């Protein structure tokens, strides 16, 4: 998924927020066998550009700050996706197509419970969400996140 903006609370705990635009991403739904049934792991990897930073913190180009922002944004996205999945399970609807992933991965098992997927299985199916977020640039906020070749040469000298 790309082209949308993620806004999370300020990582320093104060007032304000940080916003990032997703420039590229990939989502994988991985069915697995767990405790005698089907479970899923949703893996999301995204590259983002910081578009707004309303927090008191060091420049985003510093590695520690960038890593902290990546963790905060990843955590926020993980919670939102997990909440969406919980809502769909409570509503007994499968708009993402988890059932189709289960059918492809475990066709014989799925055939035995296909008619009951929505009622009995999907609402109780464990789903783990993992997010890996990488900040590529800070846009106009503080300049590039990664040091330029010139900056690297200056550090070495």
Q: What is each of the regions a protein language model found here?
A:
Residues 1-157:
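Membrane-proximal alpha-helical signals and transmembrane carboxylates
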